[in-house]
């Protein structure tokens, strides 16, 4: 479709793969217009923020996402998705769908192996949010979920192995390679 957008970003994470300190934030406004080739006229706002703080071998993670559609009708390509590690970990990737999506998370990670070649971590997250047709339902009908995971920093990037859980379904197992922070992993599509 045809759209205009403006995007502002702030990235001070010390490591895109397994950050130990810093913050990442992104704000984006998108205006899709039929006159530019879009299927419908609609506007969307996306905001995300993640931060890390480390004390010795202990790391605290916090973050949130708020993506909203300002119009009632949107084409299927404008729908937001949630699910997957650190994006409503108790749900399969992209299994939560809606014109609006939001979540908050808090996490803890402990460095169990301090080898410079293959550092290893064990961590957990607690997450709350949802995808919904109406903006007001994102958090009022939110779902509690989280994860327990192992992470290893390899020369090819991090490997995450874990289990996600949610209040309304059984466990979701995951194996993930690569970045979970930064612009490539925080987008809506």
Language-model segments: residues:
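Acidic/histidine-rich, metal-coordinating catalytic segments
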Residues: 127
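C-terminal outer-membrane beta-barrel translocator/porin domains of Gram-negative envelope proteins
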Residues: 1-120, 124, 132, 175-182, ...
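C-terminal beta-signal and terminal closure region of outer-membrane beta-barrel proteins
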Residues: 135-189
């Amino acid at each position: 479709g045809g759209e205009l957008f403006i995007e502002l970003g702030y990235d001070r994470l010390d490591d895109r793969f397994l950050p130990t300190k810093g913050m990442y934030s992104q704000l984006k406004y998108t205006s899709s217009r039929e006159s530019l080739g879009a299927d419908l006229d609609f506007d969307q706002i996306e905001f995300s923020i993640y931060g890390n703080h480390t004390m010795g071998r202990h790391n605290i993670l916090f973050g949130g996402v708020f993506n909203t559609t300002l119009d009632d009708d949107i084409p299927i390509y404008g729908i937001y998705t949630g699910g997957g590690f650190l994006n409503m970990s108790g749900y399969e990737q992209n299994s939560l769908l809606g014109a609006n999506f939001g979540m908050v998370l808090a996490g803890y990670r402990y460095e169990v192996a301090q080898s410079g070649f293959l550092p290893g971590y064990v961590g957990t997250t607690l997450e709350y949010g949802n995808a919904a047709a109406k903006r007001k339902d994102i958090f009022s009908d939110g779902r509690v979920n989280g994860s327990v995971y192992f992470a290893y920093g390899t020369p090819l990037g991090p490997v995450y192995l874990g289990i996600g859980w949610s209040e309304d379904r059984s466990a979701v197992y995951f194996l993930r390679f690569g970045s979970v922070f930064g612009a490539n992993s925080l987008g809506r599509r």
